[in-house]
Amino acid sequence: MRTTIDPGIDRPTIFLLDHIVYSHVQNLGGQPLDLDLSLMLPLQNNGEMRRIFGNNQPEERPDATTAPQAAKPAAPERPVILWFNGNGFRGIDKNCQVADLEFLAEAGYAVAFVQVRSSAQGHLPAQLIDAKTAIRFLRANAGKY
């Protein structure tokens, strides 16, 4: 006898896009340093996945015998929450609280976990500049994600 258990919860699929480089800077020693962020997104359908990750199938081209195709739906606009770990600029993995903040993505928000330079990599206001740069990057690339 088979029994199907329905937990009664319909949760969206949550994706974590990691290592999105938003800035190239130098540390205090002059060595190059890539600053990156992670983006946690709730995806509602496969169309959103294709928009972000690309489609591996060749695109169909309509010809004179086929009906015109409808315009592709626009990406849903979501508010973005930027998350900076409270580490006193001592250095910590930006993704250490992903599981704790999954509820925000389930509620429909996009959550950006942003890496900023530690105090060993740059003196204040370098961290504020990094935060502003991350905001500019997200605004400029909002349509991509």
Which residues are covered by each model-predicted region?
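N-terminal cap/lid segment of alpha/beta-hydrolase-fold proteins
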Residues: 1-75
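Short beta-to-alpha linker loops that shape the active-site pocket of alpha/beta-hydrolase fold enzymes
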Residues: 87, 110, 115-119
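Short N-terminal helix/helix-N-cap motif within the alpha/beta-hydrolase-1
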Residues: 91-95, 121
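Short amphipathic alpha-helix adjacent to the substrate-entry channel of hydrolases
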Residues: 95-112
